[in-house]
Amino acid sequence: MPREIINLQVGQCGNQVGSEFWRKLCQEHGIAKDGRLEDFATLGGDRKDVFFYQADDEQYIPRAILLDLEPRVINGIQTSDLRNLFNPENIFISKEGGGAGNNWASGYTQGEAVQETLLDMIDREAEYCDSLEGFNMCHSIAGGTGSGMGSYMLELISDRYSKKLIQTYSVFPNQSESSDVVVQPYNSLLTLKRLTLHADAVVVLDNTALDKIAVERLHLHKPDVQQINSLIATVMAASTTTLRYPGYMNNDLVGLVASLIPTPRCHFLMTGYTPLTAENAAGQVTSNIRKTTVLDVMRRLLQPKNIMVSTHTKSRDIANAKYISILNIIQGEVDPSQVHKSLQRIRERKQANFIEWGPASIQVALSKKSPYVQTAHRVSGLMLANHTSVRHLFNKVLRDYEKLMGPKQERQAFMQAYRDVPRFADAAGGGTALLEEFADAKEVVQDLANEYAACESADYIQRQMMAS
């Protein structure tokens, strides 16, 4: 029986990426942009019910909730070719319409102010499910709505639906470009705290790496937002393919998460995808892939240039960094014996450096390709990996935060906009509650980075047992 997943898309980035995700799911299941089943979509074998439900007129409606504090992006969706796809009752735009002003505190408190409205939407959607498994949330960690309101949604759902899984697709800002959002490090730190404490799995999507992949692998001179969002949506769709086109293993979200996350706090996952082709980047000319054997795909997935997280590590750190776990989702008509041979070759050549305290093996899930989408390649692959080098991304957030705040909170640059939010202003006007919030978030994120560093040690398990 399908285990349903409710999808939340929060803020500008979340809704832009989310609309691309639903566009891909409709294509893969033979669903027209108005939710009607295409005449040619008669083959079956897929589980549409995981992400869609049917209305009385048999229209397929996404299990999606669209949230934003300013109207531009959602208004764009409502006037696009997807305008008849979503349930209008599941769309929330703030009545003020002024957005969060790139301010985490504003996004958080505006979400808190409409708690009952948000819960009504979530509860109603949950009632449409026969066996709700969990939630996916798509958002950015750097702006105001995706970070602040997204953080509030994580707290709200983990409290209300404590036994259901929460997985996020979290977009990290481009580290190689100067941002016009000067408080980006504040927003990122406060959001990372909630992702650490309230999410069960976080798929890290790093704009730095995505831009680099688009330029170097897809030969796009200046990739635009839509092209990057299409890449992200490709990863999202591929990561759910075993749920929608089930095989023998990894047919539910619980199984996927359990196979990748042996220790609860270390639940931040990297991704790699191959082959990167024209359909991944909205029809642009791309690099030619000459062959797509299982071995070729699995080798490519381990190449750093295909990983969608950029950690800017020193050579010494790279040598110490290790895989905690790897799950390769291989799509296409594949002979299982070829998978076994490919794994043997990779193991013999020691192409993946694993932790010493866990099973040093690559897990593989085989999935069918959609019969309704024509591709130029026979086999494609997505890697979901738990890798200790992700800690360098957290350390970068901490360093950027300290540049603004100061090591002992002595600088407090650009803090006034946060202090102006009533929740974080105390009676004395000093914003003590806000400073405590930042100090706590810093400690949580530092502990997270330290935990990933500790995973690189052979005696990690013994240390954990002694600590407990």
Curated annotation (Swiss-Prot):
GO MF annotation, one: GTP binding
Superkingdom in the source lineage: Eukaryota
SUPFAM superfamilies tied to this protein: Tubulin C-terminal domain-like, Tubulin nucleotide-binding domain-like
GO terms classed as biological process: cytoplasmic microtubule organization; microtubule nucleation
Keyword Transmembrane part of the UniProt annotation: no
One Gene Ontology cellular component annotation held by this UniProt entry: microtubule
Binding site for GTP: 142-148
Keyword set, alphabetical order: Cytoplasm, Cytoskeleton, GTP-binding, Microtubule, Nucleotide-binding
InterPro entries: Gamma_tubulin (IPR002454), Tub_FtsZ_C (IPR008280), Tubulin (IPR000217), Tubulin/FtsZ-like_C (IPR037103), Tubulin/FtsZ_2-layer-sand-dom (IPR018316), Tubulin/FtsZ_GTPase_sf (IPR036525), Tubulin_C (IPR023123), Tubulin_CS (IPR017975)
Localization in the cell: Cytoplasm, Cytoskeleton, Microtubule organizing center
Keyword GTP-binding in record: yes
Pfam (any one): Tubulin_C
Entry-linked PANTHER family: TUBULIN
Known function: Tubulin is the major constituent of microtubules. The gamma chain is found at microtubule organizing centers (MTOC) such as the spindle poles, suggesting that it is involved in the minus-end nucleation of microtubule assembly.
Entry similarity comment: Belongs to the tubulin family.
Official protein name in the record: Tubulin gamma chain
Naturally occurring in which organism (per UniProt): Chlamydomonas reinhardtii
